[in-house]
Regions:
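Beta-alpha junction/loop-to-helix N-cap segments that form part of ligand/metal-binding clefts
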Residues: 22, 28-30, 43-50, 58-132, ...
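Extracellular/periplasmic periplasmic-binding protein-like sensory domains
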Residues: 236-309, 367, 371-374
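Periplasmic-binding protein-like
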Residues: 91-104, 124-126, 168-171, 219-228, ...
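Segments of small-molecule ligand-sensing domains
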Residues: 296-306, 317-373
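Loop/turn elements at helix/coil->beta-strand transitions in domains of secreted/extracellular proteins
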Residues: 27-29, 67-70, 94-99, 118-122, ...
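Extracellular/periplasmic Venus flytrap/periplasmic-binding protein
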Residues: 83-86, 130-132, 139-243, 278-288, ...
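Acidic/histidine-rich, surface-exposed loop or edge segments in extracytoplasmic proteins
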Residues: 32-40, 272
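Short, low-complexity disordered leader/linker segments with a strong preference
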Residues: 1-30, 374
Length: 375
């Protein structure tokens, strides 16, 4: 009996492909996303997921990748650092995902990475541009968007070119906010300038009164804003209420559509840096593709966050295609590192064994009088 059992075990071992990492079966590949799906920043995770699903639905309707459908499972990290590690652990240890994508946030990202990196699970696309998640380079993390340093450089360049000299910073009191503050400082230092004044807000709150008082007292020409959309909206409303004439500039993480919705009529003239193409245009092929597939998936509320999710999914799928018919996590890493100047339809990403930055694309948009975005 023991010999028979041993023979069965040996046969089973031989029948199991040597490449079979968790999350891969003959018919499917399981991906995981841990992001914020509840609380003040929920729309960021929801829209990111919508963009991802729009592209994965299309891929699956057309035979999947090497005959396997690509499924997505999500966990809510609530944009809380204390919750984040457990969310990634559930994806990796309980759900046994093959790879990860579409994470959201700097502080939560920093809390997730020790878990995902220790497990050597590839992670594609983080909705954050913070340097602390990019330097030193992490072998298992592939960024799709430009950094906050790239964004704040673009913002400062714009402010200075239009005559602005007094530049303040309103930022979230955590790693995300500090990344944007530091980027602004670097951009100003290059021009022989300094941050004129600053104020902070705690994560997941809208207690901005002290920041409004400190910044408004200095009468800045412009305010660079590095926080979530709820606190940024409240800050702008209160600044306008006290008569500030400053121009407000947000980095992309704010969630453009969510900010515009939260501001209503107070949003006119507010600027936002963007790290993906304008999602309402038609000139860029990948934008038209996003619009068509989002509509098929039932997501007709086009926005920058979903556009980023869509591009993230495209990068992941391209990596899976290049990883071959017998994918492994290490094979996916190597496949992604081989993607040099890949055209996703007018949006380019490039990786190598020493560079996982992906893109440096940055654009500026403004909220118009009707809440729609202008370039």
């Amino acid at each position: 009996m023991k010999r028979h059992a041993a023979a069965l075990l040996a046969a089973a071992a031989l029948a199991t492909p040597a490449w079979a990492d968790p999350g891969v079966t003959p018919n499917r590949i399981l991906l995981g996303q841990a992001a914020v799906f509840s609380g003040p920043a929920a729309q960021l995770g929801i829209q990111m997921r919508n963009g991802i699903k729009a592209y994965l639905d299309y891929v699956n309707a057309n035979g999947g990748v090497h005959g396997r459908r690509i499924d997505l499972i999500t966990e809510d990290d609530k944009y809380e650092t204390a919750v984040a590690p457990a969310a990634s652990k559930r994806l990796i240890e309980e759900h046994k995902v093959f790879a990860l994508l579409g994470y959201v946030g700097t502080p939560t990202g920093a809390a997730h990475l020790p878990v995902t990196t220790a497990a050597k699970v590839p992670l594609v696309g983080m909705f954050t541009g913070a340097e602390i998640l990019r330097v030193p380079m992490n072998r298992y993390v592939f960024h799709v968007r430009a950094s906050y340093y790239d964004e704040t450089e673009k913002i400062v360049e714009q402010v200075v070119s239009t005559g602005g000299k007094k530049i303040a910073v309103f930022y979230q009191n955590d790693a995300y906010g500090e990344a944007g503050r530091k980027g602004t400082e670097i951009a100003l230092t290059k021009r022989g300038m300094k941050i004129f004044s600053s104020g902070t807000v705690e994560r997941n709150t809208v207690k901005v009164e002290d920041a409004v008082k400190a910044i408004n007292a200095t009468e800045p020409d412009a305010v660079v804003m590095v926080s979530a959309y709820t606190s940024c909206a409240e800050f702008i409303r209160q600044m306008k209420k006290v008569g500030s004439g400053a121009t407000f500039y947000n980095v992309s993480f704010v969630g453009s559509k969510a900010l515009a919705d939260a501001l209503g009529t107070d949003g006119s003239g507010v600027a936002i840096s963007q790290v993906v193409p304008f999602p309402w245009g038609t000139a860029v092929p990948v934008v038209k593709e996003y619009q068509d597939l989002a509509k098929k998936a039932g997501f007709t509320d086009y926005n920058f966050s979903a556009m980023e999710g869509f591009l993230t999914a495209k990068v992941m799928v391209e990596g899976l295609k290049r990883a071959g018919k017998s994918p492994t996590r290490e094979g996916l890493v190597e496949a992604l590192e081989g993607m040099r100047d890949v055209d996703l339809g007018g949006f380019y990403v490039s990786y190598s064994p020493t560079n996982h930055a992906g893109s440096k694309f940055v654009d500026l948009t403004i909220i118009g009088r009707n809440g729609k975005f202008l370039r």
